[in-house]
Each structure stands twice: as structure tokens, then as C-alpha cells.
A protein has these predicted regions:
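Glycan-recognition and catalytic cores of secretory/periplasmic carbohydrate-active enzymes
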Residues: 25-418
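Bacterial N-terminal signal peptides that target proteins for export
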Residues: 1-11
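C-terminal motif of bacterial Sec signal peptides marking the signal peptidase cleavage site
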Residues: 20-21
Length: 418
């Protein structure tokens, strides 16, 4: 009995040491990420005129800046991430200088509350005004959120039960056109509607959000948990007309960032509603991602999970174009952030730990020299090696503000879980 007790005590002590070591490593990971982010975004803030919002780097090597005004093209869907990054730097450091910077660039984006040209008002407002309200609640921020949610409702159809992403979409080869496209990314914009309902209690915001989430669950998610990128609806009957892709490899493939949006989006829907089917769908999508045979060893995915595996594509795919297919750091960052929330809703401790471990592995890879830029490099963005769209030849192997945003958001979640 004494020997057993000694062995048990030694085992418990060893476990405590291991846990402490893991916790210390994760604390260093958080501090490293935010220290470098502060260095980069101090320089970014100094270099960026007020009212302009960094998105990526042009092929010429110059920082691509987008104005605050709503655009029909949807090119400014990323505008909220820059102020959101500044808000998270304030949240982590408590430094009021970051708060002042965040307030300035957030207020300059208020014009977006009237954006009705595309679905991404949710991304724009919740990454900026949503973070502002989270860290510094005020009637001003609340009113902008609620007003913007009203603008988003203008794109909802009772017939399809969904919010229309764009007014028109044509496939890369010009073979197919739809006037009611809904992409998996759109799920993320429900955050705005759910928040407006939470702030007002007005069900005009809740019902469209629930309807869109339910339709996405039914029509975008495959049996294996992967997500179709684009579902085309018949605007007169509400029926599904086609399932396609815009940014993925093929109609049948799983676009990596689209998969991240599915995991994150259904996790967010569960947060607001506690509907078990949303949790089940989020887990199904997460399991597809983290267990996929084509996920690289460092857990940073290629831009699509099925490159070269299907033939239903309409773009000029050249298997010899890249020595190695581009990775998408933004997909890993968004997935890591989603997993660190998802794990808190899972009853099975082993499953929750699996999600946490997967997230930490992604974050550790992103914080390595292979993905995190040195101070003053990378046009002052934090992470390297993201992809906007290979089929569109758009921003391939470039930095993106949304990669930095979700990386820092994930680090804050990890910090709160230490």
C-alpha cells in the first residue's frame, strides 16, 4: 500500500509539473504573439492614414489600403479587422494608447452601418464596433450595431430563408450564373443579427438569423462535415438550384477557409442559441478539419483540402504552378479561435481536450518563424502565408488582416483558458 501511495504521489507530482510546463509554454506563446503584434501594428498605425484600412499586400509590394465607404464590389469586407486588432491589443495590454487608436479607426468606419450592397456588414461591424462594445460598452457602439443589423436585414428573403451574399455570381468559366448566391462565409455575419437581438430583444433580428443558420446547416454541410462554398437558390421558389465554389478548388472540394467559417459560424450560433444541432454541426465540421488526411504536420492547411482530387472545376488549374501548394494561415487562425470556444461547449473531456490541443498546435505553428513576420517586415502585418483565392489569382501567399485578427482573438481565448 505504501509503495502504491508513493507511486501515485509521484505520478500526480509529475502530472502537475507537466501541466505547469504546458501552461508556461502557452503563456509564452500568448506573450510572444501580442508582443510582435504590438510592434507591427504600431508601425502599421503610423503608416496608415485615418479612414483607410489595410487588407493585404499588392503584387507590387505595396500595402493594399481600402477606404471606409461601402463598396458594391465587396472588396472592403475586411475593413473591420484592423480596428478589431487594435481593440484586442488594448484588451491584452490595458494600454489606453491602444484604446485611443482603436476608437479613432472604429469611428471612421461608422459609414459602413448603412452598407446594403453585400452580406459582409456583419464581418465589418462586429470585428470593429462589436469589439469596441465588448471592451468599452457605450450607447454609441450599441446604436451602430443595431442600425447595421437593420441594414443587413434588407438582404434577407422570406422565400429562400437566407441572406443573399452578392446580387449576382458567375462561375470562373462563365458556365453558370445565379442571382441568389449564398456562401458559407455568410454564416459569420449572423453574429451581427444575434447581437442586435441580444441588445434589443427584437425578434426581427432573431428569426432571420435562425432561418439562415438552419438553411446553411441543411444545404451547405455535407455528410462528412465538409462545407460547400456556395449554394445558389431560386429566388422565386426558394429551392436549391446548384452547389458550387468560388474560391475553392472545385465544386466538390472543401475550401479550407470556408471550412473554418463553418466551424466558427456554427460555434457562434450555438453560443447565442444553445441549439444542440448547431453544436453537433460545429463539431462535425471541426472533426473534418483536424482529422483530414491532407492536413500538413504543422496543422496549417493548404488553401483547399482536395487539390487535384476532383474534376468539377472551371478555372485554369495547373498542377505544376507551385512547388508546394500554398498554405492558408488565415484558415488555421480562424479555426484555432473557433476550437478554443467550441471546446468549452463539449461535454466529453477527451473531445474538448482534442480541440484545445489542435488549436494550440495551430497557434504554435503560426507563432513560429515560418509564419510570423519579424519586426518591421511583411508590410507590418503579423502573419505571412495566407491566401484570398487561388482560382481568382488573388492575394496568394500574402498577409491578410483577417489572419492577424483571428490569430490574436485565439491567443486571447487561450490566455483566458490558462
Amino acid at each position: 500500500m505504501k509503495v502504491f501511495l508513493l507511486n501515485r504521489s509521484a505520478t500526480l507530482l509529475l502530472a502537475a509539473v507537466v501541466l505547469m510546463s504546458c501552461s508556461e509554454n502557452e503563456q509564452r506563446l500568448v506573450e510572444k504573439g501580442f508582443e510582435r503584434a504590438a510592434q507591427q501594428y504600431e508601425l502599421m498605425y503610423e503608416a496608415t492614414p485615418l479612414g483607410m484600412y489595410p487588407r493585404t499586400v499588392n503584387n507590387s509590394g505595396e500595402t493594399r489600403l481600402i477606404g471606409a465607404e461601402p463598396l458594391k464590389s465587396g472588396a472592403n469586407w475586411t475593413n473591420g479587422f484592423y480596428p478589431g486588432i487594435l481593440w484586442m491589443l488594448y484588451a491584452h495590454t490595458g494600454d489606453v494608447q491602444w484604446k485611443a487608436k482603436a476608437e479613432k479607426v472604429t469611428r471612421a468606419l461608422e459609414v459602413q452601418k448603412n452598407q446594403i450592397y453585400h452580406h459582409d456588414i456583419g464581418f465589418i461591424i462586429m470585428a470593429s464596433f462589436g469589439k469596441a462594445y465588448e471592451y468599452c460598452p457605450s450607447e454609441y457602439y450599441k446604436n451602430v450595431i443595431v442600425h447595421a443589423a437593420g441594414s443587413q436585414l434588407s438582404r434577407f428573403s422570406e422565400i429562400t430563408g437566407t441572406t443573399k451574399s452578392w446580387d449576382q455570381w458567375t462561375s470562373r468559366g462563365g458556365i453558370y450564373t445565379t442571382y441568389y448566391p449564398v456562401i458559407i462565409d455568410n454564416l459569420m455575419n449572423l453574429d451581427l443579427l444575434f447581437k442586435a437581438y441580444e441588445l434589443t430583444g427584437d425578434e426581427k433580428f432573431l428569426k432571420p438569423a435562425l432561418s439562415h443558420a438552419d438553411k446553411t446547416m441543411a444545404n451547405h454541410i455535407r455528410e462528412d462535415g465538409s462545407a460547400y462554398h456556395l449554394v445558389a437558390y431560386n429566388p422565386e421558389t426558394g429551392e436549391v438550384d446548384a452547389r458550387k465554389t468560388s474560391q475553392g478548388f472545385s465544386d466538390s472540394s472543401a475550401w479550407s477557409r470556408g471550412q473554418a467559417w463553418a466551424i466558427y459560424g456554427f460555434t457562434m450560433c450555438y453560443r447565442f442559441t444553445k441549439k444542440p444541432e448547431y453544436l453537433e454541426t460545429a463539431m462535425k465540421a471541426a472533426d473534418f478539419f483536424i482529422n483530414h488526411k491532407n492536413l500538413p504536420e504543422d496543422s496549417i492547411p493548404y488553401w483547399d483540402f482536395n487539390i487535384g482530387e476532383f474534376t468539377d472545376y472551371e478555372w485554369a488549374y495547373d498542377p505544376e504552378r507551385f512547388e508546394e501548394e500554398p498554405r492558408d494561415a488565415s484558415a488555421a487562425a480562424a479555426t484555432a479561435s473557433a476550437l478554443l470556444e467550441l471546446k468549452s461547449y463539449v461535454d466529453d473531456p477527451a473531445k474538448a481536450q482534442q480541440y484545445r490541443d489542435a488549436a494550440v498546435k495551430m497557434l504554435s505553428s503560426l507563432a513560429s518563424p515560418a509564419y510570423m513576420a519579424e519586426r518591421g517586415e511583411n508590410n507590418y502585418y503579423l502573419l505571412m502565408h495566407s491566401v484570398a483565392s487561388v482560382p481568382h489569382n488573388s492575394s496568394i501567399d500574402k498577409p491578410e488582416t483577417y489572419a492577424d485578427y483571428y490569430f490574436l482573438e485565439a491567443l486571447l481565448k487561450l490566455k483566458n483558458d490558462l
